[in-house]
A protein has these predicted regions:
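Amphipathic terminal alpha-helices
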Residues: 6, 279-281, 293-302, 307-325
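N-terminal Rossmann NAD(P)H-binding glycine-rich loop of SDR-like oxidoreductase domains
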Residues: 7-28
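NAD(P)H-binding glycine-rich loop region in Rossmannoid oxidoreductase-like domains
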Residues: 60-100
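Glycine-rich NAD(P)-binding loop of the Rossmann-fold in SDR/ketoreductase-type enzymes
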Residues: 61, 92, 96-107, 144, ...
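Conserved Rossmann-fold NAD(P)-dependent oxidoreductase catalytic core, especially the SDR/UDP-sugar
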Residues: 79-81, 106-148
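Active-site Tyr-X1-5-Lys
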Residues: 132-134, 145-173
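NAD(P)-dependent short-chain dehydrogenase/reductase
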Residues: 162-218, 224-229
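Mid/C-terminal beta-alpha module of Rossmann-like enzyme folds, strongest
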Residues: 202, 230-285, 289
Length: 325
């Protein structure tokens, strides 16, 4: 006898994380996955049960459209609120960022609480909530002081998630992603996009511009595989895993410099690939990048059962393996 069907809604599903998460969820024939974005998403090519995918094209900033998407997916096992304007585009257009990343997300969270009180929600936040003045090492106990529009929007929604969870309106967690490397596909309008591009583009015979010349610039990174595994784990966490009014958790990442990535590229892909990496300084992007925290202590999320990658070389090898499929 077939099991009871579980419904999962993923917004921002035309990006990287949404399709990868959907593919993982679709390993189970009892999972029905609803994918929605401004542009109609595609069925993940590796989906084991593609018949269980529902594709919904919608502008979630339109209240009526958003409500129709939610209604189609009810009753929900979990909703993954992943839609938003990325860091570089947010800084270039703060009004749009506020409309999408704050107003649109807020409306959806409140509507989910209204139509299915206590539903599990996973909100995608970011390490960009941290900004100057930064301590030597950042933990969940560090007070976020975002110095960019993107981080500001994410932190505002984290606070709303905290309060909705505290009041029992949602059963929610906010996950602060490190930079996911290597992202497949085309470059995104994120300031950190080059951290994937520096591997992805040369491995595909394309030049990659670097927005800063400092090869020792460090960032916190994780692979798509680890990000998806941690999403699945946190989706199944009990409600009391974190205090009711403190629902944000940092997803584990590794600390790697630009040089670490270049060294891994040369080792895995060949020294000739380095010639495709070009310095093209971008002061606006560099300012955003240098405002973010990179030295984070991940002992708490690891103790709670999340996982991390080993090193930069592992990130590159994982991506190269996908090119051979």
């Amino acid at each position: 006898m077939a099991g009871q069907k579980r419904h999962y809604l993923i917004t921002g599903a035309a990006g990287l994380v949404g399709p990868a998460l959907a593919e993982r969820l679709l390993e189970d024939p009892d999972n029905i996955v609803f994918l929605t974005d401004l542009i109609k998403p595609s069925i993940p090519p590796g989906a084991k049960h593609p018949e269980n995918v529902r594709l919904l094209e919608a502008d979630l900033c339109d209240q009526s459209a958003m409500e129709k998407v939610v209604a189609a997916a009810l009753p929900l096992t979990a909703a993954f609120v992943f839609h938003g304007i990325m860091s570089g585009a947010s800084e270039a257009n703060p009004a749009l960022a506020m409309k999408v990343n704050v107003d649109g997300v807020r409306s959806m969270l409140l509507h989910l609480a209204k139509v299915q009180r206590g539903v599990r929600v996973i909100f995608s936040s970011s390490n960009a909530v941290y900004g100057a003045p930064l301590p030597e090492v950042v933990t969940e106990a560090t007070t976020p002081t975002p110095t960019g529009v993107y981080g500001c929007c994410k932190y505002m929604m984290e606070i709303l998630v905290n309060d909705l969870n505290r009041r029992g309106e949602l059963d929610a967690y906010s996950v602060r992603f490190p930079t996911i490397v290597v992202r497949p596909g085309k470059p995104s309008p994120a300031a950190s996009a080059f951290l994937s591009g520096v591997i992805r583009e040369p491995m595909n015979g394309i030049e990659c511009p670097l927005p800063l010349t400092d090869r020792q610039f460090k960032a916190t990174l994780c692979s798509p595989r680890v990000a998806i595994e941690n999403l699945v784990r946190i989706t199944n966490w009990p409600s009391d895993k974190l205090p009711p009014h403190q629902r944000a958790i940092n997803f584990p990442g590794i600390i790697a410099s630009v040089q670490d990535l270049l060294d891994a590229l040369a080792k895995v892909g060949g020294e000739d690939k380095l010639a495709l990496v070009k310095d093209e300084p971008n002061a606006a992007y560099e300012a955003i990048l240098r405002s973010w925290a990179w030295s984070l202590d991940y002992s708490k999320p690891l103790e709670l059962g999340l996982i991390g990658d080993e090193n930069a070389e592992g990130l590159v090898r994982e991506y190269v393996a996908t090119l051979k499929k």
